[in-house]
Amino acid sequence: MPSTTIHTFSDIDFDSPGKRHYELAFHHDGTWGNVLVPLTVVNGQRGPGRTVAVFGGTHGNEYEGQVAGWRLSLELDPAALAGRVILMPRLCTPACDAGTRESPLDGVNMNRAFPGNPRGSTTYRIAHFVTTQVLERADVVLDIHSGGRVLRFPFCSSFHEVPDAAQEREMAEVARLFDTPFVMIYAKAMASGLLTDEAEAMGKITIGTELGHGEATIRQGVRHAEVGIRNVLRHCALLAGDLENALSLIHI
């Protein structure tokens, strides 16, 4: 999968029809000098529409979102799409490479780093890019998490209570598209600096998930993620077709 290395973020083409793969270079005073974070932009050829942003690998030891996001970056066909999809399947790339929750470069938890800092350490600069370049463009934000090494959740999608009733109603509707046994609603913020909190505060339709656990990639969790994301694209009229049921696609 050929990609273009980007050192100046204004060189990213977010608008032309087609699919483009990038590696975003964030300077780091290490052996290779840069951390390369993958980003894929898919602009549909069926016309304008909403923008859906998909994140995996916010924590590096949570694998289901990384697998689902990477597959979708390869499979989504611009000819079948309206609107735009932005995918960052390995958001905290240093943590993904190391299989750790926090980045080994600066010890920072990406999901406590938002809205980021353009002059901070690597994790804060990645978070700042996401806030200013991706969330600003998005209408719908999907942050795919799982339990990682130490937590075990039932499969669930999630969102937070927000002051805007219309925003919360659509989030409740979208959360059900992942066809998980549970939808978890956070009554208050669990911490500061979350990607989902930042997106919700910007008025975006924002959904998180917990889709796996342990030192493995859970197949059913990947399917919930893949089918859920595609269902969201159908809900938003980016893709045509009927909604899928995640569990019906699991072959035991």
Please tell me what each predicted stretch does.
Residues 1-251:
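Structured catalytic-domain cores with a bias toward divalent-metal coordination
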